[in-house]
Regions:
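S-adenosyl-L-methionine
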Residues: 2-88
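Charged, often flexible domain-edge or linker segments that flank or initiate folded functional domains
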Residues: 2-4, 8, 12, 17, ...
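Conserved proline-anchored active-site loop of SAM-dependent methyltransferases
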Residues: 75-78, 90-109, 113-120, 126, ...
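Conserved phosphoryl-transfer catalytic core
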Residues: 120-181, 316-324
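SAM-dependent nucleic-acid methyltransferase catalytic core
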Residues: 178-291, 298-299
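Mobile active-site "lid"/loop adjacent to the S-adenosyl-L-methionine
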Residues: 296-337
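A short glycine-rich, Lys/Arg-flanked "PGG" loop and its adjoining helix->strand segment in the class I
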Residues: 335-351
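Class I S-adenosyl-L-methionine
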Residues: 365-374, 382-422
Length: 422
């Protein structure tokens, strides 16, 4: 019998402390050294590592991630931890999956995945991308969906869509509801629903709607009427089937056959949950090698206002879902909820397994959630390996009264890294 040898344990805190960022093709630079500070969490000294940790190679993300979703991190973040802290066949988990960045990236890298999100739209947008369809089969399925010219809309959407576009959307919605109700819903239907959900509203002709806010920020009917008046616009016809095909081509443009096979293999074993992240009894104890996630922050997202069209299209009761989603306005309430999440993460994490917990700066940096999270994790039994502050400097171009300005800006990720004692 052949015994597979696992690589030596990766000391991530030492790696981060010694890391030097070198720009591509700069052969003579010694690189930008990591700045290391220490903070005291209760009586525990926790290192804080600051640098630009993603390399130019790591910044090249797969096109399969190009799905709009509010407050999502870039694929480079989970890839960094998945590559260093797991091996093929290990299980990667995200308790707040969102659009599925961690799940898709783990699948691309040959890991098993467990996804959870209290928002049912998460699974609708994530799961289908593990099963990339054959283009001919997809086109045939789309052409087979009949357009009902007499279908009536249960809500007024004339301010968003041309009447013929709306007929196509309503026909597709009814088709998907019927297929699911009769148990005929398959991978092709899931893919069509995912892409259509992403194309419902947006700010270019690549979307079904007239010009409106980006797709992750749906506006109300009254607000759209005002936008139409301000822009002196009326909805033009959009060919929904053609747009679904073109968005599909965009999503798979740089996905290799090997990656498609890896995603499908991960999808075949994947577990998708729609539970409170504090109560995921389906996940067995000590089975997860790595969790990479970003939780909901302090009342920064208005679920019902942002997602009412997406929920309507997918026959989801938006107010019911909104009530289930954590929107803590007080830091004390947020800490209490996250303590429950970390208690559950400790239960399901393997010995020597890791958690990478990304948090942002909220309320203009007045509340540093990373320090709160470090304390929460330590109190639940984890070892805090450090706080990783990834600072990516970029140049942003603005144009004011014909004068161009290049301003230096910084995108910052704060990731608190934990390990379970082995």
């Amino acid at each position: 019998m052949t015994t597979l040898l696992r690589r030596a344990p990766f000391e991530i805190d030492k790696y981060l402390a010694d890391f030097r960022h070198v720009e591509k093709n700069d052969l003579f630079s010694k690189g930008q050294a990591t700045k290391t500070d220490r903070i005291i969490i209760d009586t525990v000294s926790v290192p804080k590592f600051t640098n630009e940790f993603w390399t130019s190679r790591q910044r090249q993300a797969s096109s399969i991630h190009e799905i709009s979703y509010r407050a999502c991190f870039k694929p480079q973040l989970p890839r960094f931890f998945i590559e260093f802290l797991t091996e093929e066949g290990d299980t990667v988990y995200d308790p707040f999956t969102g659009r599925g960045t961690t799940i898709i990236e783990a699948g691309l890298l040959g890991r098993n995945v467990i996804s959870n999100d209290i928002n049912p739209l998460s699974q609708i947008l994530c799961k289908p991308r593990l099963f990339i369809p054959d283009m001919t089969q997809l086109q045939d399925r789309l052409q087979a969906i009949k357009i009902d010219k007499k279908v009536a809309s249960p809500i007024n959407l004339d301010m968003f869509y041309h009447k013929n576009t709306l007929q196509e959307i309503l026909s597709l919605r009814n088709y998907l509801i019927e297929r699911e109700k009769t148990g005929q819903h398959d991978e092709l239907d899931m893919w069509i629903r995912m892409v259509a959900t992403n194309r419902l509203t947006g700010h270019s002709k690549g979307f079904f709607s007239v010009y409106t806010f980006p797709p992750n920020q749906a506006v109300s009917q009254d607000r759209q009427i005002k936008i139409n008046k301000q822009r002196e616009q009326i909805p033009e016809y959009r060919d929904t089937k053609k747009l679904i095909m073109s968005k599909t081509l965009q999503l798979i443009k740089n996905v290799s056959k090997e990656q498609i096979a890896r995603l499908r293999a991960a999808g075949g074993k994947a577990v998708f949950l729609n539970d409170d992240a504090r109560e995921t009894d389906v996940i067995k104890k000590q089975t997860v090698s790595l969790t990479v996630t970003s939780p909901p922050f302090l009342d920064v997202v208005q679920y019902a206002a942002d997602n009412w069209i997406r929920c309507w299209f997918n026959n989801i009761a938006v107010e019911s879902v909104s009530r289930k989603i954590t929107m803590s306005k007080k830091i004390e309430d947020w800490v209490d909820i996250m303590s429950g999440v970390f208690k559950e993460l400790y239960r399901i994490t393997k010995k020597s397994g890791f958690v990478a917990f990304e948090v942002g700066e909220v309320r203009n940096g007045k509340i540093m959630l990373d320090e709160y999270v470090a304390k929460i994790g330590i109190n639940q039994g984890f070892i805090c390996k450090g706080i990783m502050v990834n600072e990516q400097v970029f140049t942003k171009t603005s144009n004011l009264w014909g004068i161009s300005n290049n301003d230096r800006g910084t995108n910052t990720n704060r990731i608190v890294i934990f390990q379970k004692d082995g």
